[in-house]
Each structure stands twice: as C-alpha cells, then as structure tokens.
Amino acid sequence: MQWYLVAALLTVLTSSQGILTTLSQSNGKYKYDYATIPFLAELFKLSFSSFFLWKECQSSSPPRMTKEWRSIRLYLVPSVIYLIHNNVQFATLTYVDPSTYQIMGNLKIVTTGILFRLVLKRKLSNLQWMAVVLLAVGTTTSQVKGCGDAPCDSLFSAPFQGYMLGILSACLSALAGVYTEYLMKKNNDSLYWQNVQLYTFGVIFNMGWLIYGDFKAGFERGPWWQRLFNGYSITTWMVVFNLGSTGLLVSWLMKYSDNIVKVYSTSMGMLLTMVLSVYLFNVRATLQLFLGIVICIISLQMYFMPVNMLVELPQALPVTSK
C-alpha cells in the first residue's frame, strides 16, 4: 500500500473523529463514560494486530519477532509518555481555556520536526523546515477567533504556568510520536508483533486509568467493568472503531513512512473537520479558516514537491562549431 493512500485515509479518519464524538453526545452531554473509549480502542487495536500476527505465524515463512525482555520493555515507554501527557493536559486546562490550549497544541508540529532531527537523525532541507513552520502557522491561523471575541482576548491573558504546561504538553506529544517511530524502525520485526507489544501496554495503562478513576470517585458508580458499555450507541461504537483504526494507520506510517507525514495528515484532518463543521453544525466560516487552509496547502506542496519541480532548470545552450 502506498504511503500517500494511508495518509489520505488517516486525514479522513482524523476529521471524522471530532464529528463522530460530537454526534455521540445527547443534549450536549455524554451518556457514556468517555474514559472507556481509549480503553476499548486499544483493545480493538490489540485484537486486530493479534489476529493478523496469528495469520502470519500460520504462513510458510513465519514473521520475525524479537522476544527478549530488553526489547519488549521499550514498548512500555510510549504508554508512560502518554500517561504523563494526559495529566499535563488536564493540568494545562486548569490555567488556560480550550481555545488557547488548542492553539498552543500546534507547537507539536515544530517540536516534532526538531525531535525528528535530534532523535532520528533525519535531516530536513531549509525548504522543508519552512514548510513545517508554515503548517504550524496555518493550523494556528485557522483556529484564531476574531479579535472582538472572548477567546482572542484571553489568548495572552493566561498565567505563566499555563503556557509552560502547554509547551510541555506539545513536547511530550511530539516525543511520543518520534519515539514510537524509532521503535518501529529499529529492527525488521513484524509490524503486527510490534503493534501487539505496543497495544498490550496501552490496554494495561488504560485499564489502570479506569481503576484509578474508580478509587478517586470512591466507587460511587460501581467498578468500571460494570458500566463499561452503559450509554453506548451505534455512534459511540463508531467513535471507538474510528479511534482504533486511526491508531493502526499511524503505526503503519511510523513503520513505513515517518512522523512528518503523520503530522501533515492529522493537521489536514483538523482543517477538514472545521470545514465539515460549517455544513454539519452551522459553525460560522471565518476568514482565518480560509487563510489557514491556503497556508497549509502551500506548506504541503513545499514539503513534498521535488526540488526539480520547484526550480526551472536552465536549458543547455546549443554547441556551435567555429
């Protein structure tokens, strides 16, 4: 499968995630425990990967699987990073409003590029660096409200701790992505075997988060497994399937492409969500959204277009004999 087909599908699924999540609400509230969504998505990814790993093991040429603990334990790290990131995310939102947090989240685009260079030793050209910065500018522009709106007034009025936590959140998100790419490419193990290790720890940590929530609430609603499917509808299951499928596509890109492609896919997905929201939820289209889309398209072209298509090479002069 070509990487650009996977990237396009990831863009569609990313844009669908926010829309499906909104549609799963009833009167602006969730009837289900939204903390169960990541757990079920991890369980779906683990089941999917386990099935196809089993299919590979039944073939005439068994897949390569590194089973030493010193290798397996490395797959624990992304789950730890995401656990820290989730806590930092909640802490950040106590200091800043959601709009400011979303705008600061675009810093992960640039930090991904920096870690891409430092950790994976992948060099970007000057033009590609400009494209990455433009992508961050474009996505930020699309999310900025009009200067007469409250979100615009509050953008620079948050406490200093809020901005520091927002930067830390962006760095942790980028670090998790870059580290996952390092894991996927460090050997020639089967993608499904790598996924099984990654998602096993994901299931364990998400289950631990649900148990922690029960203890924190004093088991007022009973243990998490008794209310696991409470309030679930067809739309809710679509959210689970969408989130799980998105994770599987991301792991494919980490293995066979890179983090920058993933960043472009998810960023374009966010822009597509905004455009679709104009038609589905009567959200007002803004000049900022239009300008952000234009900037991101220019960035996309700058990053992926071959150099010989960007510069018209001079034609060789005909040789004349004297």
Swiss-Prot record:
Q: Name one GO cellular component term.
A: Golgi membrane
| TM region positions | 3-23, 34-54, 76-96, 101-120, 127-144, 158-178, 199-219, 234-254, 263-283
Membrane topology is: Multi-pass membrane protein
Q: Which GO terms describe its molecular function?
A: pyrimidine nucleotide-sugar transmembrane transporter activity; sialic acid transmembrane transporter activity
- In this entry, the parts of the chain located on the Cytoplasmic side of the membrane are 1-2, 55-75, 121-126, 179-198, 255-262
Entry's family note: Belongs to the nucleotide-sugar transporter family. CMP-Sialate:CMP antiporter (TC 2.A.7.12) subfamily.
Protein's recorded name: CMP-sialic acid transporter 1
